[in-house]
Curated annotation (Swiss-Prot):
Residues 1-31 are annotated as: Disordered. The chain crosses the membrane at residues 155-175, 189-209, 244-264. The gene is ARV1. Plays a role as a mediator in the endoplasmic reticulum (ER) cholesterol and bile acid homeostasis. Participates in sterol transport out of the ER and distribution into plasma membranes. Disulfide bonds: none annotated. PANTHER family: ARV1 (PTHR14467), PROTEIN ARV1 (PTHR14467:SF0). It is found in: Endoplasmic reticulum membrane. Belongs to the ARV1 family. This is Protein ARV1. Keywords: Cholesterol metabolism, Endoplasmic reticulum, Lipid metabolism, Lipid transport, Membrane, Steroid metabolism, Sterol metabolism, Transmembrane, Transmembrane helix, Transport.
C-alpha cells in the first residue's frame, strides 16, 4: 500500500536510443509533475489557510488517506468526507472552515447563475412592493405591459445597486492595498466569493410568498445575514482581519446608498410615483 500512490518510470533498454528516449520522457514527466504541483498548490488548509499540494492521497484499491497540513498538523480539508448538507449547514453558520473548503478546495461554476437568480429574487421583491403600493383592477393590456416593464426596471436597478456595492468593496481594498503591502489581491476570486456568499437573497421569495406581520423583520434579518456572509467571504478569501473586512462592507454599503439616493432624486425629478426606496428593506 505504501507504493500504491507512486508511479515509476523506466528508460529504454538495450541501446543508447532507448536511454535517450527514456531520459526525454523522464524530463517531460518531471516538467509535467512540476506544473501539476504548482497548480495543486491552489489548495488551502481549512484550519490555518496555508497552501497545500493535495487534499488526499489515492492509493490502490480505492484506499484514500487525507493529507495532514505541515503547518497546523491537522487534516487539510476534513469536509471532503462530509455530506454536502453538513457543509451547507456549516456555511450557513458562517464557519471559516466551510468557506475555505467551498472557495479554495472545490470547483463550483455556478457564480453567474446564482447571481442572476438572486437578482431576480430581489427584483421580484421590489416589483411586489411596487404593485402592492399601487393596486389597480384595470384589466387593460397596457396596464399589464406596464407592470411587466416595471419588473424589468426593478431588475436593472437591483443590478446597478449590487454593482455599486461591489465597486465600493473593491475600491476600498484597492486603496488599502499599498498600506498592507502584501500579496496581490485576487479580485476575480473575491468577486466569485461575494456572489456565492449572497445566496441568502434566495430567502426573499419564501418571505414574500408566506407574507405575515413579521415580513419586514424577516427582510431585515435576511439583509443582515447576506452582509455577514459577505463579511466572512472577504475575510476568508483575502485572509485579512475582521476590522478591514468590516470597513470593506461599510464602503460597499456607502457606495450602494449613494446609488439609491441617486435613483430617489431621479425618480423625484421625473415625477414618477415609484417610491419603493423609501420603505423597502433592500
Amino acid at each position: 500500500m505504501g507504493t500504491g500512490g507512486q508511479n515509476g518510470l523506466r528508460p529504454g533498454k538495450g541501446n543508447t536510443e532507448g536511454v535517450k528516449e527514456g531520459k526525454g520522457k523522464t524530463d517531460e514527466v518531471t516538467m509535467t509533475s512540476n506544473t501539476d504541483a504548482s497548480a495543486s498548490c491552489q489548495y488551502r488548509c481549512i484550519e490555518c489557510n496555508q497552501e497545500a499540494k493535495e487534499l488526499y492521497r489515492d492509493y490502490n484499491h480505492g484506499v484514500l488517506k487525507i493529507t495532514i497540513c505541515k503547518s497546523c498538523q491537522k487534516p487539510v480539508d476534513k469536509y471532503i468526507e462530509y455530506d454536502p448538507v453538513i457543509i451547507l449547514i456549516n456555511a450557513i453558520l458562517c464557519k471559516a472552515q466551510a468557506y475555505r473548503h467551498i472557495l479554495f478546495n472545490t470547483k463550483i461554476n455556478m457564480h453567474g447563475k446564482l447571481c442572476v437568480f438572486c437578482l431576480l429574487c430581489e427584483a421580484y421583491l421590489r416589483w411586489w412592493q411596487l404593485q402592492d403600493s399601487s393596486q389597480s383592477i384595470d384589466p387593460d393590456d397596457f396596464i399589464r405591459y406596464a407592470k411587466e416593464w416595471d419588473f424589468y426596471r426593478m431588475f436593472a436597478i437591483a443590478s446597478l445597486e449590487q454593482t455599486a456595492y461591489f465597486i465600493g468593496i473593491f475600491a476600498f481594498l484597492w486603496v488599502e492595498r499599498p498600506i498592507r503591502a502584501k500579496e496581490k489581491l485576487n479580485f476575480t476570486l473575491l468577486l466569485k466569493a461575494l456572489l456565492l456568499s449572497s445566496y441568502g437573497k434566495l430567502l426573499l421569495i419564501p418571505a414574500v410568498i408566506w407574507e405575515h406581520d413579521y415580513t419586514p423583520l424577516c427582510l431585515r434579518l435576511i439583509k443582515v445575514f447576506v452582509l455577514t456572509s459577505n463579511f466572512q467571504a472577504i475575510r476568508v478569501t483575502l485572509n485579512i482581519n475582521r476590522k478591514l473586512a468590516f470597513l470593506a462592507i461599510l464602503s460597499g454599503l456607502l457606495v450602494e446608498s449613494t446609488m439609491v439616493y441617486f435613483f430617489q432624486r431621479m425618480e423625484w425629478a421625473v415625477g414618477s410615483d415609484c417610491a419603493i426606496y423609501k420603505s423597502q428593506d433592500f
